[in-house]
């Protein structure tokens, strides 16, 4: 809702371009380079946000309904859905309020609007941080379930899971409040970028190690059945494809946003970096897309959850 422009705030206005602007165009000024600027229509942004809201609400409802899903792994998935839900709700809310203000339908004092903007920005930032944290927590949980299978239930207990979940939410709220309060400090942006890189490295290392263990296990089975190449190659290709999709979507959806933050530190006034800043709304849209994809990757692949989801949908009719 702030009209200062996306590059002057940590989150800034989610729709700094005019609704009538073309979707794809070349922006230029007299001294700077020609820039490729992708404009995301407000209707598309709101529609994606609503799809994400529906998906993640269904995930939360299904896990809450089925007691068989009341385990640490599904609690982490549920919290990821809540984080993605908050990202979508707060982004849609900010966009809707800003459009109402621009249309003159909603009137308010500047101080009140600014306070509302700060609250929503804290909510968006906190949800982003918690979403990244729970993606890392799910990776750690899966790693322990594979490499410490016999001790998994003694390592990942419900009390420990609840403590981890509580710590993530508290840390997300505190860090997002500090990030928004000191958004114009270089250290804040560096912390956010470093956090993203740390989560990316953590997930890559854990999932690559899990893939290596799966391939090693497949080779052992192949030796017993004397079918080494077909079994090993089939599992290896399937695992590599899954790993590529998982990490690729994570990097594609989150990477541009954190590239934007990195360039705000490295070259805030450079014309070429300015071309990147013009696509800030596109980067936020990619994060919304990640909130849509997360349930497909982490939740809906579970047969038990899909069955419960069908029951939830049937009960709602």
From Swiss-Prot:
The chain crosses the membrane at residues 38-63, 73-93, 119-140, 164-183, 192-211, 241-266, 280-300. Glycans are attached at residues 15, 29. One of its GO terms (cellular component) is plasma membrane. It is found in: Cell membrane. Interacts with MGRN1, but does not undergo MGRN1-mediated ubiquitination; this interaction competes with GNAS-binding and thus inhibits agonist-induced cAMP production. Interacts with OPN3; the interaction results in a decrease in MC1R-mediated cAMP signaling and ultimately a decrease in melanin production in melanocytes. It comes from Panthera onca. One of its GO terms (molecular function) is melanocyte-stimulating hormone receptor activity. A lipid is attached at residue 315 (S-palmitoyl cysteine). Receptor for MSH (alpha, beta and gamma) and ACTH. The activity of this receptor is mediated by G proteins which activate adenylate cyclase. Mediates melanogenesis, the production of eumelanin (black/brown) and phaeomelanin (red/yellow), via regulation of cAMP signaling in melanocytes. InterPro entries: GPCR_Rhodpsn, GPCR_Rhodpsn_7TM, Melcrt_ACTH_rcpt, MSH_rcpt. Keywords: Cell membrane, G-protein coupled receptor, Glycoprotein, Lipoprotein, Membrane, Palmitate, Receptor, Transducer, Transmembrane, Transmembrane helix. The keyword Cell membrane applies. Residues 1-37, 94-118, 184-191, 267-279 are extracellular. It is a multi-pass membrane protein. The keyword Cell membrane applies. Residues 64-72, 141-163, 212-240, 301-317 are cytoplasmic. SUPFAM superfamilies: Family A G protein-coupled receptor-like (SSF81321). Its main location: membrane. This is Melanocyte-stimulating hormone receptor.
């Amino acid at each position: 809702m702030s009209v200062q422009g996306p590059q002057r705030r940590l989150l800034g206005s989610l729709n700094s371009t005019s609704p009538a602007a073309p979707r794809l165009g070349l922006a230029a000024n007299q001294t700077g380079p020609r820039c490729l600027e992708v404009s995301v229509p407000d209707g598309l942004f709101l529609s994606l946000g609503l799809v994400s809201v529906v998906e993640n609400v269904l995930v939360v409802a299904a896990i809450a309904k089925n007691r068989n899903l009341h385990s640490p792994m599904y609690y982490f998935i549920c919290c990821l859905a809540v984080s993605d839900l908050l990202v979508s709700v707060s982004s849609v809310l900010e966009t809707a309020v800003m459009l109402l203000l621009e249309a003159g339908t909603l009137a308010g004092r500047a101080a009140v609007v600014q306070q509302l903007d700060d609250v929503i920005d804290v909510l968006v930032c906190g949800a982003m941080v918690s979403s990244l944290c729970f993606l890392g927590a799910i990776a750690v949980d899966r790693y322990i379930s594979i490499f410490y299978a016999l001790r998994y239930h003694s390592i990942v207990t419900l009390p420990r899971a609840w403590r981890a979940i509580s710590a993530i939410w508290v840390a997300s709220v505190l860090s997002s409040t500090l990030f928004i309060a000191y958004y114009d400090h270089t250290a804040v942006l560096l912390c956010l970028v470093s956090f993203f890189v740390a989560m990316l490295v953590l997930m890559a290392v854990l999932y690559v190690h899990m893939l290596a263990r799966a391939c090693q296990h497949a080779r052992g089975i192949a030796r017993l059945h004397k079918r080494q190449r077909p079994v090993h190659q089939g599992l290896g290709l399937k695992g590599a494809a899954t790993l590529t999709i998982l990490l690729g979507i994570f990097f594609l959806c989150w990477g541009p946003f954190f590239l934007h933050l990195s360039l705000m530190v490295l070259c805030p006034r450079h014309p070429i970096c300015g071309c990147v800043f013009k696509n800030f709304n596109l980067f936020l849209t990619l994060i919304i897309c990640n909130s849509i994809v997360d349930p497909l990757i982490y939740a809906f692949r579970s047969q038990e959850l899909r069955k419960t989801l069908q029951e939830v949908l049937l009960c709602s009719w």
